[in-house]
Design a protein with these regions (language model features):
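Short histidine-centered catalytic/ligand-binding loop motif
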Residues: 70-79, 127-139
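A short, charged
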Residues: 82, 86, 90-98, 151-172, ...
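Non-catalytic substrate-recognition/targeting regions of SAM-dependent transferases
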Residues: 107-120, 139-210, 219
Length: 404
């Protein structure tokens, strides 16, 4: 496609379709569409009309995807380089107002009205994840705009790495891509977050290298960890464990099934001078927790930060079983009056269902939960109301007490 900004045709909705869209949603699904004009090009821009031919907006189209249209604008008018640059400016300006920008998510797809692209900043390195065909064609333009805008804020970028290697790209008819955008650089980046130093592996780490969405949740557990014996399950590269360590925990055990992650976590502990307090074990959490219970272990604080147990509605029942089991096991290991931090990062595990599942786990082990905090993802992962896909992280902190 020679002209990125060309409107390639019109997509028309079925009669009565598009209710979610009309209430603020950002996606149009394949089963909501009536017709495509002959000129429509997959990956291109289109006008979206309702069944009565009323203009509803401009978006990217991809007939190979169940999410067939991703909305870019609700207004008539030209989409051009300045339009895209303003979206990027708005995204950066929002982060400057709301979060520590030394390391943060700068662009969060639909929630920043740039559907299908995620860009994280780790110190002076950008990591790009493109998940949709339409926005993929704007990727270089967005990166160039971002570098220019950050430089104006006094934050020059030394390198950009692409981690568009998620399986979801195949649903868009795209290959999984990974590599440098521009000049090569050392992909092991050191950052500081909440006073904790980390090495972030942007090339081979999970997702883009570090889960920035938990930034302030990691800090929130600190006050409970002073002098405490702490268990951090699904520790990844040790972020919750290290926050517990610098907050004065007496001992911390971090557990993860990935040997690569555990090795990185151990290195991060040494980087912070915490290797005598924070130690890590490579093990399956579902296997280890019953073993710890059998041996009579108890902890002042237990942290559960599992991966998404479901990425579709079809597997939600199995996910509920997984979350119930892990919370049940975790509660059994908390001392009477101790604390549990537990979360779900699956969009399909909605807040109501997650809350219900935790409650069932507590009843099964005869524990009472005293809620201290309920939190979501950090503000650099904004939750756009009516765009349900932007809310995915649920995070509780409880005091766990025996039934009285």
């Amino acid at each position: 496609m020679t002209n990125l900004f060309k409107i390639t045709g019109t997509v028309t909705l079925k009669k009565g379709a598009g209710r979610q869209l009309k209430s603020g949603g950002m996606w149009v699904y394949d089963n909501e569409i009536d017709t495509f004009s002959e000129t429509v090009e997959d990956g291109g821009l289109i006008e979206l009309h309702d069944f009565d031919d009323y203009f509803m907006g401009i978006g990217f189209v991809n007939r190979r995807s169940k999410i067939t249209v991703r909305m870019l604008s609700r207004h008539e008018g030209e989409i051009n380089e300045e339009f895209i640059k303003q979206r990027v400016k708005d995204a950066v300006s929002y982060r400057m107002d709301t979060v520590d920008t030394s390391s943060c998510r700068l662009i969060f797809g639909e929630a920043d009205f740039l559907p299908g692209i995620v860009i994280d900043k780790f110190s002076d390195v950008l990591v790009v994840e493109s998940l949709a065909l339409g926005i993929d064609r704007f990727k270089q333009l967005i990166v160039d705009d971002l570098k220019e805008i950050l430089k104006e804020y006094g934050m020059p970028i030394r390198g950009v790495y692409e981690r568009s290697d998620a399986k979801v790209r195949q649903l868009e008819g795209m290959e999984r891509v990974k590599g440098f955008i521009g000049e090569e650089f050392d992909t092991k980046v050191m950052i500081t977050e909440n006073g904790v130093k980390y090495y972030v592996d942007v090339k081979d780490g999970q997702k883009t290298g570090l889960f920035l969405d938990q930034k302030y949740n990691r800090r929130a557990i600190g006050g409970l960890c002073k002098g405490a014996k702490v268990l951090d399950c699904f520790t990844h590269t040790g972020s919750f464990a290290l926050n517990a360590g610098i907050s004065g925990a007496s001992s911390v055990l971090g557990v993860d099934a990935s040997e690569l992650a555990v090795n990185q976590a151990t290195e991060n502990a040494k980087l912070n001078g915490l290797e005598d307090i924070v130690r890590f074990k490579c093990a399956d959490v579902f296997d280890l927790l019953p073993q710890l219970e059998k041996s009579g272990e108890k902890f002042d604080v237990v942290i559960l930060d599992p991966p998404a147990f479901t990425k579709s509605r079809n597997s939600i029942k199995n996910a509920v079983k997984g979350y119930r089991e892990i919370n049940l096991r975790g509660m059994k290991l908390v001392k009477d009056g101790g604390y549990l931090a537990t979360c779900s990062c699956s969009h399909f595990m909605d807040p109501e269902l997650f809350t219900k599942t935790i409650g069932e786990a507590a009843r099964n082990v005869h524990k009472r939960l005293r809620q201290i905090e309920y939190r979501t993802q950090s503000p650099d992962h904004p939750i756009l109301w009516s765009a349900d896909e932007s809310l995915y992280l649920k995070f509780y902190i409880f005091q766990v007490v025996d039934e009285k």
